[in-house]
Each structure stands twice: as structure tokens, then as C-alpha cells.
């Protein structure tokens, strides 16, 4: 390792800048993750609602079909 690189690792300003940058990046990533998590949860809720509606429609169609009496031919 060169002397200049070793010197930078002991430089408080350099360390502080790296720490600040790292903290900022972690905050950004955390914010992005929270946004994605919220969007994902909203999409799951929407899908769940749509599936519930589909199940209800199918249930109604099955009940309607079973309540219709069969037509008998008189010929």
C-alpha cells in the first residue's frame, strides 16, 4: 500500500467524508426500499381484492346456474 493511501485512511476529513457518503447512500437505499415495500403491499392488496371479486362472481354464477331448472323437451 502506498504512503499516500495509508495517509488518507488516517485523515479524519477523508474518513468523515466517506462516512457521510456511506450514511447518505444507506438512507437513500432505505428510502427506496420502503417505497418499493409500500408499492408491493399495495399491489398485493389490489390483487387480493380482485381475486375476492372474481371468487364472488364465480360463486354467484354457480348459484345462478344451479338454481335454473333444466328445460324438458315436450316433443
UniProtKB/Swiss-Prot annotation:
> GO cellular component terms?
cytosol; nucleus
Q: Give the source's domain of life in one word.
A: Eukaryota
Q: Which Pfam families match?
A: HSBP1 (PF06825)
**Which InterPro entries has this protein been placed in?**
HS1-bd
Q: Which Gene3D superfamilies match?
A: 1.20.5.430
GO BP terms: namely: cellular heat acclimation
Q: Name one GO molecular function term.
A: transcription corepressor activity
Identify its protein family. Answer: Belongs to the HSBP1 family.
Q: What is this protein called?
A: Uncharacterized protein C16E9.15
Per the UniProt entry, what species is this protein from, by scientific name? Schizosaccharomyces pombe (strain 972 / ATCC 24843)
Specify the taxonomic lineage: Eukaryota, Fungi, Dikarya, Ascomycota, Taphrinomycotina
